[in-house]
Amino acid sequence: MPSRNDTYDDKALSLPRILCLHGGGTNARIFESQCRVISAHLKPYFRLVFAEAPYESAPGPGVTSVYADYAPFKRWLPWLPEDEHASNEEVVHDIDQAIEEAIMSDDKKGASGPWVALLGFSQGAKLVMSLLIRQDVRRSRHAPPIAGPHWAFGVILAGRAPPVALDAGFFNSTMLCEPSQLDIVRPPDMIDAMSEDHRVRVPTIHMQGLFDQGLHLHREMLEDYCIEGTTRLIEWNAAHVVALKRSDVDVLITHILEVARETGVLRD
């Protein structure tokens, strides 16, 4: 079955590109399907590229009811007991390699547009925030950037706090969890909590379902991990899902296009 990325016409090859990171217990192919309405609305403006997480996983809740034939299922973070052999450095390497493979694969298809943004759902959204923190900390300290694109903004769909420390050798904070964990194992240091070093500085759009069991963690992600004045919030009547109804998607698309123009990614 061809990827949606293979069906773009030649004009789309030069469009700005958004890298999309799927949730835990799914995979890139499933996330393409989950984002089909979002993709259709963004197609005139962006090329969406879907990365595949590095670690195999059991299917996420409800995944097999629709996508049972889409195995193997993947996850970005090796937090299960059987994954204890993976060091934090190895996890970061595996994540970076998976992202690099998605970028190189799309380049080989002839795509030439700039990489401009990250979009993630659930565990993928946690990773989007983690990547943006790594980028912003290095930039704010005038340090050499990590090799790869500069991300102008992020789209956070049901992203649970806390983000992950992807650059512990350069910057670490008790507000961030280790790559081999899903949560912080001890209370954060008060000085770290009051600092803005762990907060994302580029614009982010947060879409949060009001019936999602993780809503309090989604709100924490926005309130505790973003610089004030850089965020946009969409609350909608849904659980832990990607928006499919046009009325819900339209709101998200409006925010994405507005932020893209504000950051200079798109020009009228």
Swiss-Prot record:
Look up and give the organism this protein is from. Answer: Pestalotiopsis microspora
Q: What does this protein do?
A: Esterase; part of the gene cluster that mediates the biosynthesis of dibenzodioxocinones such as pestalotiollide B, a novel class of inhibitors against cholesterol ester transfer protein (CEPT). The biosynthesis initiates from condensation of acetate and malonate units catalyzed by the non-reducing PKS pks8/GME11356. Pks8/GME11356 lacks a thioesterase (TE) domain, which is important to the cyclizing of the third ring of atrochrysone carboxylic acid, and the esterase GME11355 might play the role of TE and catalyzes the cyclization reaction of the C ring.
Q: Where is the active site?
A: 122, 212, 240
A single Gene Ontology molecular function, please?
hydrolase activity
Q: Which InterPro entries match?
A: AB_hydrolase_fold, FSH-like_dom, LovG
One Pfam family assigned to this protein is FSH1
- Tell me which UniProt keywords the record has, alphabetically: Hydrolase
Q: What happens when the gene is disrupted?
A: Completely abolishes the production of pestalotiollide B.
Concerning its family, UniProt says: Belongs to the LovG family.
Q: Which GO terms describe its biological process?
A: secondary metabolite biosynthetic process
Q: What is this protein called?
A: Esterase GME11355
EC number(s) per UniProt? 3.1.2.-
What top-tier enzyme class does this entry carry? hydrolase
Q: In which pathway does it act?
A: Secondary metabolite biosynthesis
What turns on this gene?
The expression of the dibenzodioxocinones biosynthesis cluster is positively regulated by the transcription factor dibT.
GO annotation, cellular component aspect: cytoplasm; nucleus
Q: Which domain of life is it from?
A: Eukaryota
